[in-house]
Amino acid sequence: MTDMHSLLVAAILGIVEGLTEFLPVSSTGHMIIVGHLLGFEGDTAKTFEVVIQLGSILAVVVMFWRRLFGLIGIHFGHPPHEGVGKGRLSLIHILLGMVPAVVLGLVFHDFIKSLFNPINVMYALVVGGVLLIIAEVLKPKEPKAPGLDDMTYRQAFFIGCFQCLALWPGFSRSGATISGGMLVGVSRYAASEFSFLLAVPMMMGATALDLYKSMGFLTMADLPMFAVGFVTAFVVALVAIKTFLHIIKRISFIPFAIYRFIVAAAVFAVFM
């Protein structure tokens, strides 16, 4: 690749990562398609994806830094988003939401890695879309937990169980956790916020492990490309999260489910 070409590829993939990482549409599915179309595949591409995921994670930290500090008992006034004030969401909620996926992820790590292929991703996109529709249809008319601080430990644990579905590549971690939250009585907005908060420790742990294993593929020559991808993913993820939290107050997740089916069809068209 030429230098300019590699930077353009980095920017495009950073945009894709930032837009899709925290939406219930599967960033994995999008990265597979776009990476294939751009001819950017292989070990360097996998390492690049790990690095730009860190940019997306940083966006969540910036967006929810007050709430994250609050989880460890450090408060800076009231966080500027809904469902805040009672201070009932705790680190225990986050830990309960993490445990199921962490345990299964460690036990079945090698098997999960073997599932990373376009066909499995395609099926996961479809099943995840169906789950979003089921969640919208079966969710309680009046949520038991309208805000984050209304969530119970039991609800947090069940959301964590649903997060295990995201170990299937292409399912979408946010899609699984948000759907699970709605089905156990958490409002669409609060379930989305909890999904974002849960992403920080989950993704940081997984990304740190992948980055450690990929160190051999990092070179100084790739640094500009990785930096462009990281910064692009961070900025785009900030905008995507803000926009997403704004629009879900007004629309259901049905459009996201339909979009997942379209992406699944695209994966089928490109790789079958």
From Swiss-Prot:
Disulphide bridges: none
Catalysed conversion reaction: di-trans,octa-cis-undecaprenyl diphosphate + H2O = di-trans,octa-cis-undecaprenyl phosphate + phosphate + H(+)
Bilayer-crossing regions: 6-26, 45-65, 89-109, 115-135, 156-176, 189-209, 221-241, 251-271
Pfam families registered for this protein in UniProt: BacA (PF02673)
Enzyme Commission number(s) of this protein: 3.6.1.27
GO-annotated cellular components: plasma membrane
Location relative to the cell: Cell inner membrane
Keyword annotations from UniProtKB, A to Z: Antibiotic resistance, Cell inner membrane, Cell membrane, Cell shape, Cell wall biogenesis/degradation, Hydrolase, Membrane, Peptidoglycan synthesis, Transmembrane, Transmembrane helix
Main location: membrane
Keyword Cytoplasm attached: no
Keyword Membrane set for record: yes
A biological-process GO annotation: regulation of cell shape
Gene Ontology molecular functions: undecaprenyl-diphosphatase activity
Topological relation to the membrane, as annotated: Multi-pass membrane protein
Main EC class the enzyme belongs to: hydrolase
Function: Catalyzes the dephosphorylation of undecaprenyl diphosphate (UPP). Confers resistance to bacitracin.
Additional information: Bacitracin is thought to be involved in the inhibition of peptidoglycan synthesis by sequestering undecaprenyl diphosphate, thereby reducing the pool of lipid carrier available.
Record family assignment: Belongs to the UppP family.
Protein name as it appears in the record: Undecaprenyl-diphosphatase
